Structures are given as structure tokens and as C-alpha cells.
Amino acid sequence: MIEWGCGDGNQLSLAEYPQYTGLDVSPCVIEKVKKQFANDRSKMFYEVGEFLENPSSAELGLSLDVMYHLVNDEIFESYMRNLFTYAQKFVIIYSSNKDQPHTQHVRHRQFSSWVQKNAVEWKFKTMIPNAYPYDENKPNETSFCDFYVYEKK
């Protein structure tokens, strides 16, 4: 699997994958997770640019809590193309899926319309609702995201 936006490894430390490639735009983050998982040969980490110089693909492309941080249209477009291009069978996205401005560093997008228009070889499989839907009275205990699963046709 390839995770686009692996972050600091907190979520990864809770999961077990037979093979894992984690990508991020932050050199500091990549350095941290390389050290954190140095003894685990099933995990590899790259800066996105480094990965794209010699890309590979995997059965699953994964995007967790990244999409709504992509406030720039060009970066969003590139991210989505990469997410779907380098996935062989499945893409799983954990994100909001509505067009709505939020703050300077958050932009909710209806990414499903992008997939429908630009990744026609992929079909929507299912949406798994978040067990803790967003509650403005409990913003640190809830989330505005759900899981969206796509399968290659």
C-alpha cells in the first residue's frame, strides 16, 4: 500500500500492513518516521518528489486526513492524480466530501465529483460513516470525515 501523506507515524503505529510505503511533502516528517520505524523492513518512507522520480504502484492507495488540508487547487489536482494513478485495485480516502470553506488552512472539497470526472476507470464502492460524527461541542472528540472506498473497474 502507498499512503499519500503519512504524517508523523501515529496512525501507522496502530496498524499492521504486509508492505507499506509512506509519502509526505515534509522532509522533517520523513526523517522522523524513518528513524521511528528503522527496524521494520516492511515499511519505506519517501518525500513525494523523491518517490515520483522512480515511482512504484501498490494494490491500495490511502489518504487519511489529508484532503481538506489541500487548499491550493493545483496541489489538490496533483495529489488526486497521484493517489489514483499509483493505486492498482483500491483507493481509500478518509475525509470530508463537501465543498465548504472553513479556515485558512482547511478547505473542504467534494472530492467525489473530481473522481467521477477525472478517474473514470474507478468506481465508488462504499462509504463507511464515521463512528464519531462532528459535534461542534466536542471538536476534539469527533470528526467531519468518513471513509470512502473506490475500486478499479
Locations of regions flagged by a protein language model:
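Polar, enzyme-active/binding microenvironments
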Residues: 59
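Short catalytic micro-motifs in class I SAM-dependent methyltransferases
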Residues: 65-69
